[in-house]
A protein has these predicted regions:
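Fe(II)/2-oxoglutarate oxygenase catalytic core
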Residues: 1-159, 167-213
Length: 213
């Protein structure tokens, strides 16, 4: 068997959520009274702190959308580890590395919106990223890794998970040229973050193994 490549570590599950489930999550964004925020982080290639043009709201704990997203991400994490096992190449302790969400971000990319090349790891326990694409009524908005050298076109209900090791997993969302893209995203952590209560945790098979790097 050949050695796994970087692109092998990106796991995509097509049509995982139904149209109805996707609509439920979009509806929370549209009806939520939460502040519609913008985010900023360092541009991977210039090092400049850059504000992106999409808007974001935090999914409210115990809402219908929250439960859909939480169950989906937990299932995908388990599938991802089972998939990685097929390479017979990775440390078993990785199963204890993605047990908690940072938070569930509901994201809206209107026409002209994008997110610049960046990484998700903050140096404090973010080990993976997961995104759920919620609609397909838009043009542009392609998910791109490594300056566009690897691109993934996501459809409604698609779920994608990948590692978030600092500096290597540079990714972006290209500009929306028509329509509006909705997505849900979360960072996957080995310890609880501040956004949700500590009982918000994934039931990951084999996660009782000690982490040892």
């Amino acid at each position: 068997m050949t050695a796994p490549t970087l692109t092998d570590l990106i796991y995509l599950k097509k049509n995982y959520l139904s149209e109805e489930q996707c609509k439920t999550i979009i509806d929370e964004y549209q009806k939520s009274m939460c502040v519609e925020d913008r985010e900023n982080c360092f541009h991977a290639f210039t090092g400049l702190n850059t504000t992106s043009t999409y808007t974001v709201k935090t999914c409210q704990q115990d809402s219908k959308s929250f439960n859909i997203i939480h169950q989906t991400v937990g299932n995908i994490i388990n599938e991802y580890h089972d998939y990685l096992d097929t390479f017979d190449a990775f440390h078993v302790s990785r199963r204890a590395s993605m047990l908690y969400p940072h938070k569930y971000r509901l994201m809206k990319y209107s026409k002209g919106a994008w997110i610049h090349p960046h990484v998700d790891d903050d140096g404090a326990g973010i080990n993976g990223s997961c995104t759920i694409n919620l609609n397909s009524e838009y043009e542009g908005g392609t998910f791109a890794f490594w300056g566009g050298k690897h691109k993934v076109k996501l459809g409604r209900g698609d779920v994608m998970i990948w590692p978030a090791d600092y500096s290597f997993w540079v990714h972006e969302v290209e500009e929306i040229t028509e329509g509006t893209r909705y997505s849900a995203n979360c960072f996957l952590c080995d310890k609880p973050k501040f956004d949700y209560t500590q009982d918000v945790k994934y039931d990951v098979k084999g996660s009782d193994v000690a982490i040892g790097y």
